[in-house]
Curated annotation (Swiss-Prot):
SMART domains: Arg_tRNA_synt_N, DALR_1. Keywords: Aminoacyl-tRNA synthetase, ATP-binding, Cytoplasm, Ligase, Nucleotide-binding, Protein biosynthesis. The gene is argS. One of its GO terms (biological process) is arginyl-tRNA aminoacylation. This is Arginine--tRNA ligase.
């Protein structure tokens, strides 16, 4: 149950009732009450919730916002749940609640257990999250790694929030890059077999391609040497793509990312999907021919220039395939499509939304998360290249260096739109300075407390014992109340992080919860001689374990019981 949302609804109803009462009494002159926000103030002294409704309606009421706020506050029925309601600043209304609303949270967490934090906000709506979609011509780099952590955590959040989620990897296995890949493979293949051939100028210079061709020769010898060049390239690409994709899949699984669908760009060409998309665009009036090429009328939809879809040589552009791919996504019946792209694709977002509109779908159902760059630091200096390979640092190397959990946490710690400075030394440090260590240590400490309690013969109150009258009101220390409040926040936090596509909120929540638990443990002795207080605190400790575990699992991290 989302206790925070329930309280929001209760406060909202009280505000609406107060406004309607003031309007009926001719104290204020306002029309229909618009939707208004109820937020949690940053400063505790500003109460538990705050609203700006008076500021929203002041102009219509022809009153100063503070004056309108005071009219509202005067008519709010405080009942036995509202401790205080005050006007603050330019016209905010701050609400402070009695602690009683928090206590039902504790047994609810026990009852829900692994499902605590889940909600039905998504109502089963179908969502596709496409992320990473790295070129299968090389290894996964830091941008891919950040996208993997963000995308997978977002997918987990959406599932928790009640959406039907599909994770998809788009395989870029067609177009110019594959032609260059084929030429590169052929050159390395021939060179390894003793032929003196030049390497293509725009080829892929990675050592991994040499290793791929060396592996092929070890398995199959020079059987492709006698083939005509185009056929040889086709066979080499087929072998290399299979190997590269297997390697990418293994690396991502090692990183905790498992996809539901791997979608091939080449399949769009082979199935006629691109041609069908062009026909749809033509029927909708968004295609014209110029100098032998087919163009998309992007300017008719507000873009600065039109885009080529089919070159004069008859070969479709990448954009044509991308439009066909997005049409395919919506053809499959998704209610919401989310792409995670690198920030260098920012110019492509509006083009793609307009293309979605041009093929007959609602562009508002497509969201694109743009992800900023990652910089690795070691010893206070930027790490640009791998010492082992002389190339960019790969995700495999990062996992070896800092571990999956630290890598995933660090990548999700900042919003996608923020540049990320990844400190390798910090990620390995076993101290409170390292955020992932700090959070996981909190979970391990909780497990240690529960083991100690069990060894002393004390059990966490369960089911009937709680329902039969465990007095939770003894939990009245500020550190206890702050911890319970944070626990109560989780379902609301998950729902917001999912619907607003902000997986970094989970990292922040985990850190806040860990800090509040450490504070509680410092100020409140758990295994006290007072049975009633001890039982209540053991329940709070176990709830903290459940919540921290659920958040760590949502982020794709382990919840260690010992450290």
């Amino acid at each position: 149950m989302n206790f925070v949302e329930a309280i929001r609804r209760r406060i909202s109803a009280a505000v609406v009732q107060a406004l309607e009462g003031a309007r009926n009494a001719k104290e204020v002159n306002v029309g229909p009450i618009p939707p208004f926000a109820l937020e949690v103030p940053r400063e505790k002294q500003h109460g538990d919730f705050a609203t700006n409704v008076a500021m929203l309606m002041a102009r219509e009421a022809r009153m100063n916002p503070r004056q309108l706020a005071e009219k509202i506050v005067a008519r709010i029925d405080r009942g036995d749940w509202l401790k205080d309601v005050q006007v603050a600043g330019p016209g905010f209304i701050n609400f402070t609640l009695h602690h009683a609303w928090l206590y039902p949270v504790l047994p609810a967490v026990q009852q829900a257990d692994e499902a605590y934090g889940a909600s039905k906000v998504g109502a089963g709506r179908r969502v596709q999250v496409e992320f990473v979609s790295a070129n299968p011509t090389g290894l996964l780099h830091m941008g891919n790694a950040r996208g993997a952590a963000l995308g997978d955590t977002l997918a987990n959040l959406l599932r928790l929030a009640g959406f039907d989620v599909q994770k998809e990897f788009y395989i870029n296995d067609a177009g110019n890059q594959i032609e260059n890949f084929a030429k590169s493979l052929e050159a390395r293949y021939l060179q390894l077999l003793g032929r003196d051939v030049p390497f293509p100028e725009e080829g892929y210079h990675g050592e991994d391609i040499v290793e791929t061709m060396r592996g092929l020769i070890a398995k199959e010898g020079d059987k492709y040497l006698a083939l005509e060049s185009s056929l040889r390239r086709e066979m080499l690409v087929k072998y290399a793509l299979r190997e590269k994709l297997d390697a990418i899949r293994r690396t991502l699984e090692r990183f905790g990312v498992v996809y539901d669908v791997w979608f091939s760009e080449q399949s769009l060409h082979d199935s006629g999907a691109i041609q069908q998309t062009l026909e749809r665009l033509r029927a909708n009036g968004y295609i014209y021919e110029n100098e032998g090429a087919l163009w998309f009328k992007a300017t008719a939809l507000g873009e600065e220039k039109d885009e080529v879809l089919v070159r004069s040589n008859g070969i479709p552009t990448y954009f044509a395939a991308d439009i066909a791919y997005h049409k395919n996504k919506f053809d499959r019946g998704f209610d919401w499509v989310i792409n995670i792209w690198g920030a260098d694709h920012h110019g492509h977002v509006s083009r793609m939304k307009n293309a979605v509109k041009a093929v007959g779908y609602d562009p508002k159902k497509l969201d694109v998360i743009l992800m900023q760059l990652v910089r690795l630091y070691k010893g206070g200096e930027i790490v640009r290249m791998s010492k082992r390979t002389g190339q960019y640092i790969t995700l495999d190397e990062l996992i070896e260096e800092v571990g999956k959990d630290a890598a995933r946490f660090f990548f999700v710690m900042r919003g996608a739109d923020a540049h990320l400075d990844f400190d390798l030394d910090l990620a390995k440090r076993q101290s409170s300075e390292n955020p992932v260590f700090y959070v996981q240590y909190a979970h391990a400490r909780i497990c240690s407390i529960l083991r100690t309690a069990q060894e002393a013969g004390y059990a966490v109150p369960q089911g009937q014992q709680v329902e039969a009258g465990l007095d939770l009101t003894v939990l009245d220390h500020p550190a206890e109340l702050a911890l319970i409040r944070k626990i109560a926040d989780l379902p609301d936090e998950v729902a917001r992080a999912a619907t607003q596509m902000e997986p970094h909120r989970m990292a922040r929540y985990a850190q806040d919860l860990a800090a509040l638990f450490h504070s509680f443990y410092t100020h409140c002795r758990v295994l006290t001689d007072e049975k009633e207080l001890r039982d209540a605190r053991l329940l709070l400790v176990d709830d903290s374990r459940i919540v921290l575990r659920n958040v760590l699992h949502c982020m794709g991290l382990t919840a260690p019981e010992r450290m």
